[in-house]
Amino acid sequence: MNITIISVGKLKEKYLKLGIDEYIKRLTRYAKLNIIEIPDEKAPENLSSAEEQIVKNKEGEGILKNIKDGMYVIALDLKGKMLSSEELADKLQSLGVAGNSNIAFIIGGSLGLSEDVLKRADYKLCFSPMTFPHQLMKLILLEQIYRGLRIIKGEPYHK
């Protein structure tokens, strides 16, 4: 399985980088992993909705350029479907069985994802109705992918 994580923003926090590096190392036993970071656009506090759309569209263009033909795209979105770890494992396994071995997970910037990215998504996944920093979300996503792949292999995991 080939998994690509496309996220907006460069990771700056050392403690998150350490956790992400750990899960990247663990995941190499189960999948080929590629992480792509798209530069985030400057977004001052008081943007109008039109200015927010411009920022999301610019970030979205960068995301869409990195989605290859044939990739199954899972966008992280507050309006997406919430799954348990076991259900995510089932989803990943069913994608592999259906011949979708190239999966891209998309993490938007602080303003979310553009409409074009959401339209391109084959599936929308929500981890929680709460909002998380997108850098932290990358770590959470990697942990859940790792957990899901261990579930698929029938290996023990912490419940």
UniProtKB/Swiss-Prot annotation:
Its EC number is 2.1.1.177. One of its GO terms (molecular function) is rRNA (pseudouridine-N3-)-methyltransferase activity. HAMAP family: 23SrRNA_methyltr_H (MF_00658). It is found in: Cytoplasm. This is Ribosomal RNA large subunit methyltransferase H. Keywords: Cytoplasm, Methyltransferase, rRNA processing, S-adenosyl-L-methionine, Transferase. S-adenosyl-L-methionine binds at L76, G108, F127, S128, P129, M130, T131, F132. It comes from Alkaliphilus oremlandii (strain OhILAs). It is an enzyme of class 2 (transferase). Specifically methylates the pseudouridine at position 1915 (m3Psi1915) in 23S rRNA. Its main location: cytoplasm. One of its GO terms (cellular component) is cytoplasm. It catalyses: pseudouridine(1915) in 23S rRNA + S-adenosyl-L-methionine = N(3)-methylpseudouridine(1915) in 23S rRNA + S-adenosyl-L-homocysteine + H(+). It holds the Pfam family SPOUT_MTase. Belongs to the RNA methyltransferase RlmH family. Homodimer.
